[in-house]
UniProtKB/Swiss-Prot annotation:
It catalyses: heme b + (2E,6E)-farnesyl diphosphate + H2O = Fe(II)-heme o + diphosphate. The keyword Methyltransferase does not apply. One of its GO terms (cellular component) is plasma membrane. Keywords: Cell inner membrane, Cell membrane, Heme biosynthesis, Membrane, Transferase, Transmembrane, Transmembrane helix. It is an enzyme of class 2 (transferase). Gene3D superfamilies: UbiA prenyltransferase. The chain crosses the membrane at residues 32-52, 58-78, 103-123, 126-146, 153-173, 180-200, 227-247, 249-269, 278-298. It comes from Colwellia psychrerythraea (strain 34H / ATCC BAA-681). One of its GO terms (molecular function) is protoheme IX farnesyltransferase activity. Carbon 2 of the heme B porphyrin ring is defined according to the Fischer nomenclature. Its EC number is 2.5.1.141. The gene is cyoE. InterPro entries: Protohaem_IX_farnesylTrfase, UbiA_prenyltransferase, UbiA_prenylTrfase_CS, UbiA_sf. This is Protoheme IX farnesyltransferase. Pfam families: UbiA.
Length: 306
């Protein structure tokens, strides 16, 4: 017999989730969460020498993954009305009517609670509360307020999405250290050029729903300049793990190569853009971050510090 929660006009049930599992899966932004969990895994790996204890590794990844999924679902709930209008998002599960807002709220709350309990009980309270702070920062401070209030929304709000390496680090060590914050700084610096490239591509959608993204408020040319400058800043920030002795030559070569390519995309976007250049830059930025952190991982295990 399915477990059912009565929520007024709607019924939230386990059978409802199984019937619409794809829609619930989609509102958790699984590809984004996978990248966040990868960066958390790198934070864990760099925090301790040798193999990671699976008794800590599995609950940490599960808890961080569940709370990140809940944050993504809350983002869908808050943006449901503007998603209905925007071309990129009108087919998402909530505006398309595949899931009710009430059911989405119950689902998001349930997986957030489960994730928090796993982290608190099986990892440590510090990681549980930091992960919860990330959820609040992204879902409420960024999505509810900053996104609608300032063109610097993603610069400030990006901090919430940048903390998974710190969460991974604290999961293993139960302390906040400068090297963990350095990994956060990389993602924090990467976020604006990543997101603004998409915002250029979707400028008209954002203008239609009065979201003050940088291309809407300051124009596309200004935004392209900012993207180019941020890729230069990102290049410098990505050198820091090598310069402070966190990583070796393998990471240095990988970081320089990836950042040169990212800079090349940003240069083309600014000075020789074609119709698809903004979207191509956005897509490469995701590959950039994923490969950068995979190379950090390979560098750590293949070339252990002497």
């Amino acid at each position: 017999m399915p477990s059912v929660i009565n929520t007024g006009h709607h019924h939230f049930s386990i059978s409802n989730i199984f019937a619409n599992w794809r829609a619930y899966y989609d509102i958790t932004k699984p590809k984004v969460v996978a990248l966040l969990v990868l960066t958390a895994l790198v934070g864990m790996s760099l925090s301790v020498p040798g193999a990671l204890p699976w008794q800590r590794l599995i609950p940490a990844m599960l808890g961080i993954g569940l709370l990140s999924s809940a944050a993504a679902a809350i983002n869908h709930i808050v943006d449901e009305k503007i998603d209905t209008v925007m071309g990129r998002t009108h087919n998402r599960p909530l505006p398309a009517g595949k899931i009710s807002v009430t059911n989405a709220i119950v689902f998001a709350t349930s997986i957030a609670l489960l994730g928090f309990i796993i982290l608190y009980a099986l990892v440590n309270p510090l990681t549980a509360f930091l992960t919860l702070a990330g959820l609040v920062g992204y879902s409420f401070v960024y999505t509810m307020y900053l996104k609608r209030a300032t063109p610097q929304n993603i610069t400030i709000g990006g901090l919430a999405g940048a903390i998974p390496p710190l969460l991974g680090w604290t999961a293993m060590t139960n302390e906040v250290v400068p090297n963990a914050l350095l990994l956060v700084l990389i993602i924090f610096t990467w976020t604006p050029p990543h997101f603004w490239a998409l915002a250029i591509h979707r400028k008209n959608d954002y203008a239609k729903v009065n979201i003050p993204m940088l291309p809407v408020t300051h124009g596309v040319s200004f935004t392209k300049t900012q993207i180019l400058l941020y890729t230069v800043l990102l290049f410098v920030v990505c050198l820091l793990p090598y310069l402070v002795g966190m990583s070796n030559w393998l990471y240095l070569i990988g970081a320089c190569s990836l950042n040169l390519i990212f800079f090349g995309y940003a240069w083309q976007l600014k000075f020789n853009a074609k119709e698809g250049t903004a979207m191509a830059t956005f897509k490469f930025s995701i590959i950039h971050l994923m490969l950068l952190f995979i190379i950090l991982l390979l560098d750590h295990y293949w070339l252990p510090m002497g």
